[in-house]
């Protein structure tokens, strides 16, 4: 997969904030894609006491959700762990993994936030703007915003609101299990993002895309045995 993105690594938090403020103006909050044949999940893990960043991508056919390709890339970790700035720590390895793909996805589901972020530029939005592809944020925990209690049955959701703005939804992806946090990444509307996340769910809390990517990213070895995942 050809990647034309130029990634800027900030040298200070102020510079990082400036980059986020500039890039958030480029986020597109409406559907800008046509046929979807492949969806991908992206997740990041760390090795060697966080000295190495390991990005994993799982590409699945859509709507059958059959795993068709996986790629992993590992790079030295160059940015510290700071909540709200994780994209600067994780995106370099993600871009390297994307470059290895032979099957380009039509939509990417990221393990993390989209616009459900203090400066409206979580990793899904940051990545989406850089590579100019539709992305969705699918997070396991809340970063910012408030919401009402979500009914316990699968498929129910409540809007996630911050400063009077709907920044995503809190979605019950599995009955009686903790919800997930879905937000626009780039080039997709919120209703469409919810729909694709729901279509990527099976019997687990996480969509199949990010569930596969999570297993790959957390693998400590260099070789991945897919038969054991």
From Swiss-Prot:
Q: Where does Mg(2+) bind?
A: 43, 111
For this UniProt record, give its keywords in alphabetical order, as a comma-separated list. Answer: Cytoplasm, DNA damage, DNA repair, Endonuclease, Hydrolase, Magnesium, Metal-binding, Nuclease
Q: Which residues form a coiled coil?
A: none
**Annotated site residue numbers, Interaction with target DNA:** 81
According to its UniProt entry, the protein's GO biological process terms are: DNA repair
State its Enzyme Commission number(s): 3.1.21.7
Its recorded reaction(s) are:
Endonucleolytic cleavage at apurinic or apyrimidinic sites to products with a 5'-phosphate
Extract the Pfam families matched here.
Answer: Endonuclease_5
Entry keyword annotation includes Ion transport = no
Q: What does this protein do?
A: DNA repair enzyme involved in the repair of deaminated bases. Selectively cleaves double-stranded DNA at the second phosphodiester bond 3' to a deoxyinosine leaving behind the intact lesion on the nicked DNA.
Q: Which HAMAP family match?
A: Endonuclease_5
Record's protein name: Endonuclease V
- Native species: Rippkaea orientalis (strain PCC 8801 / RF-1) (Cyanothece sp. (strain PCC 8801))
What taxonomic classification does the UniProt entry list for its organism? Bacteria, Bacillati, Cyanobacteriota, Cyanophyceae, Oscillatoriophycideae
Q: Which gene encodes it?
A: nfi
């Amino acid at each position: 997969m050809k990647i034309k993105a130029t990634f800027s690594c900030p040298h200070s938090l102020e510079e990082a904030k400036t980059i986020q403020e500039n890039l958030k103006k480029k986020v597109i909050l409406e559907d800008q894609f046509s046929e979807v044949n492949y969806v991908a999940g992206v997740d990041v893990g760390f090795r060697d006491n966080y000295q190495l960043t390991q990005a994993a991508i799982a590409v699945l056919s859509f709507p059958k959700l059959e795993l068709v390709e996986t790629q992993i890339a590992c790079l030295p970790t160059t940015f510290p762990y700071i909540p709200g700035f994780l994209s600067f720590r994780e995106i370099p390895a993600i871009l390297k993994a994307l470059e290895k793909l032979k099957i380009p996805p039509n939509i990417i589901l990221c393990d993390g936030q989209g616009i459900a972020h203090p400066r409206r530029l979580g990793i899904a939005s940051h990545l989406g703007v850089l590579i100019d592809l539709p992305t969705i944020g699918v997070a396991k925990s809340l970063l910012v915003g408030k919401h009402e209690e979500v009914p316990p049955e699968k498929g129910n959701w409540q809007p996630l609101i911050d400063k009077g703005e709907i920044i995503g939804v809190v979605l019950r992806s599995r009955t009686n299990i903790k919800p997930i946090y879905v937000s626009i990444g780039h080039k997709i509307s919120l209703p469409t993002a919810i729909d694709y996340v729901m279509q990527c769910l099976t019997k687990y809390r996480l969509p199949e895309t990010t569930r596969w990517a999570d297993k790959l990213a957390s693998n400590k070895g260099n070789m991945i045995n897919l038969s054991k995942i």
